[in-house]
Amino acid sequence: MSERLSGHTLLVSLLATPIRHSLSPKMHNEAYAKLGLDYAYLAFEVGTEQLADAVQGIRALGIRGSNVSMPNKEAILPLLDDLSPAAELVGAVNTVVNKDGKGHLVGHITDGIGALRALADEGVSVKNKIITLAGVGGAGKAIAVQLAFDGAKEVRLFNRQATRLSSVQKLVTKLNQLTRTKVTLQDLEDQTAFKEAIRESHLFIDATSVGMKPLENLSLITDPELIRPDLVVFDIVYSPAETKLLAFARQHGAQKVINGLGMVLYQGAEAFKLITGQDMPVDAIKPLLGDE
């Protein structure tokens, strides 16, 4: 990358913590090189305490855009000038665009688009399907919105944090008003309801952090009877590539198991397009993600 850097190079950033596991710098910098774009992508260890200063830095330095990940997806909202309709509905942002480097920052959310493109890539359609989704943080809410917009029959949301349930219920109400999808929300602590939902679902999506370190030895599903030959299991975690959940589902005969690498690729491709105006060469970038 050093050979490409010049006084004209445009900077794109990632604001998150931790960042060591992130595939984004590799993915975006390789895409810039493939397309001959004079951009550089750098990851910065930024938590919520440093976030306001970091956002001001984007404005002051003319950084052209930034990806935003945990724990900043919701905390960044009041620091931006505008939100896309999807980001406003979800209440979270994972991409910030500084158009022309003039300091007017617009927040977008590409997680839902990325997840649905990843599923489509695996031949999985959500239209008219019953789907159970665990975890309604920034990514989970974005996926829920996209599932409803893409014509799922039912989306059954489960979340463990009782304090978040009331805010997510507002999103549920909006989705039931705006789409034909039936969206419900329940506490993940209600294991009876959780298991019943999975038994009736075509697709189970884990959008929690269970499966990542330090929770890599845990799985939301531990009952073999919940895994059926017609059930697709999608875990948005990508490191490790096979979480405890995916290994369990594969072992007990799930129709298909999908990790989060495809979602990373396609949400990144959408962010890439928003910031650069160019299509990411996903076919060239996809093989690189398997090197991790």
Curated annotation (Swiss-Prot):
Pfam families assigned to the protein according to its UniProt record, in alphabetical order: SDH_C, Shikimate_dh_N
Pathway participation: Metabolic intermediate biosynthesis; chorismate biosynthesis; chorismate from D-erythrose 4-phosphate and phosphoenolpyruvate: step 4/7
Keyword NADP: yes
Listed GO MF terms: NADP binding; shikimate 3-dehydrogenase (NADP+) activity
Residues involved in NADP(+) binding: 135-139, 236, 260
Known function: Involved in the biosynthesis of the chorismate, which leads to the biosynthesis of aromatic amino acids. Catalyzes the reversible NADPH linked reduction of 3-dehydroshikimate (DHSA) to yield shikimate (SA).
Similarity annotation: Belongs to the shikimate dehydrogenase family.
Protein name as annotated: Shikimate dehydrogenase (NADP(+))
Organism expressing this protein natively: Streptococcus pyogenes serotype M1
